[in-house]
Regions:
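Transmembrane helix-boundary elements of multi-pass transport/secretion proteins
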Residues: 2-82, 92-112, 116-137, 141, ...
Length: 162
């Protein structure tokens, strides 16, 4: 497995997502809007929000990361990029690690946006260490990226993913 090939694939994914305004809106805008609505809905019931916050954060991270990864990977397949890469000398392992790394960069950014917005803008109280929360969120994020790639291999269009 070549580190250069993995890096090239991951950097191409990063460039593609950075150029796509819809993906950037999905990474930043959608989670902030949804978490704002949730925070506003529980504005008078702070204790309920504090109890539900861990599940909400995990659910939002899982949903948004899954959708971002699955839709982006499906777009790669539908545009023929994946098939062109498979016809080159790139091994399937390099391809998989490159795609995982590329998507994981934006998934981690999105997860941190959701977490920080929930903790510091909505002001959810949390017990424990922030690093413990980030570690659990990292596991959820990696799982969601893998699930997004897995499900997108069976989907024919974006509506089947959502």
């Amino acid at each position: 497995m070549s580190l250069d090939r993995k890096y090239a694939i991951a950097s191409r994914i990063v460039r593609e997502i950075r150029r796509d305004r819809r993906s950037i809106a999905m990474i930043i805008g959608a989670p902030v809007i949804v978490m704002s609505l949730i925070g506003f809905s529980f504005q008078t019931q702070k204790s309920v929000l504090n109890e539900a916050a861990p599940a909400l954060i995990a659910t939002m991270v899982m949903f948004f990361v899954f959708v971002l990864t699955a839709v982006s990977f499906l777009r790669e397949r539908s545009q023929g990029t994946l098939e062109r890469l498979l016809s080159t000398a790139v091994s399937r392992g390099d391809l998989l690690v490159g795609y995982l790394t590329g998507f994981l960069i934006f998934a981690l950014i999105q997860s941190l946006i959701i977490l920080m917005y929930t903790l510091f803008v909505i002001n959810v109280d949390y017990a424990g260490k922030l690093w413990d929360i980030i570690f659990i969120l990292l596991i959820v994020t990696i799982t969601s990226v893998n699930m997004g790639i897995f499900v997108s291999t069976f989907a024919r269009n974006e509506f089947q993913i959502i």
